[in-house]
């Protein structure tokens, strides 16, 4: 038990994903390993988050643009969220026509074949599917459920020092840094709230299935997602 506590605190921790805000990269029913050492340690790395120190130890191990990270929600530190780092401290972020601009420069935004979403009634629905490439060369895929969604055009967000701007890959179905804290959103995320970096999908079941029902694994497990790296 002590070994398990040490591993979860300092090396990696499993997380289960609910909901669809991170499609197509991460799906509801995915189980992830999150490395706790990637950015050093803060109070939120420890069980029950005791206020033992400020900042991170060691300092200088910083998230990179495009990383998928788990963090504690600033307005409710008991809640774990997972989003992608889009804006670094000092950046100016804006979304125009569904395209992210960083410091006044639109990121590369390429249409790829539609993502096929299976609805509750069993019908397959095509969803607009994009490949986005950040200034550091990091590429990943995003979804666009509707044209001119309410977060497809925003003002300019200036990221404060020591904070990060997060976005979900399912752009029209993600509560993220585009929505401020006073509107029940994420707002800017302090460095010390970041728990770790998402690395591997070690297990995955279809939404509505229960991972502990091992007798259903032949039909409930998404076998093609096991041990998949989080990009």
Model-derived segments and spans:
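Soluble "head" domains of membrane/secretory-pathway proteins
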Residues: 11, 15, 23-231
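Hydrophobic membrane-insertion alpha-helices, especially the h-region
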Residues: 1-10
């Amino acid at each position: 038990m002590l070994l398990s506590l040490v591993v979860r605190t300092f090396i990696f921790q499993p997380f289960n994903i609910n909901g669809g805000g991170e499609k197509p990269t991460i799906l509801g029913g995915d189980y992830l390993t999150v490395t706790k050492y990637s950015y050093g340690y803060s109070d939120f790395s420890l069980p029950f988050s005791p206020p033992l120190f400020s900042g991170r130890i060691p300092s200088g191990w910083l998230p990179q643009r495009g990383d998928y990270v788990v963090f504690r929600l600033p307005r409710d530190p008991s809640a774990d969220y997972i989003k992608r780092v889009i804006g670094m401290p000092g950046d100016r972020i804006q979304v125009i026509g569904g395209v992210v601009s960083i410091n006044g420069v639109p990121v590369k935004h390429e249409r790829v074949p539609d993502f096929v979403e299976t609805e509750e009634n069993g019908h397959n629905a095509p969803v607009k599917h994009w490949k986005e490439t950040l200034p550091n060369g990091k590429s990943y895929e995003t979804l666009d459920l509707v044209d001119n969604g309410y977060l497809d055009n925003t003002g300019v967000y200036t990221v404060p020092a020591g904070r990060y701007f997060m976005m979900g890959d399912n752009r029209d179905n993600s509560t993220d840094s585009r929505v401020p804290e006073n509107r029940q959103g994420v707002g800017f995320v302090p460095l010390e709230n970041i728990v770790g970096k998402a690395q591997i999908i070690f297990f995955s079941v279809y939404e509505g299935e229960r991972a502990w029902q091992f007798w259903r694994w032949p039909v409930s497990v998404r076998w093609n997602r096991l041990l998949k790296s989080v990009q």
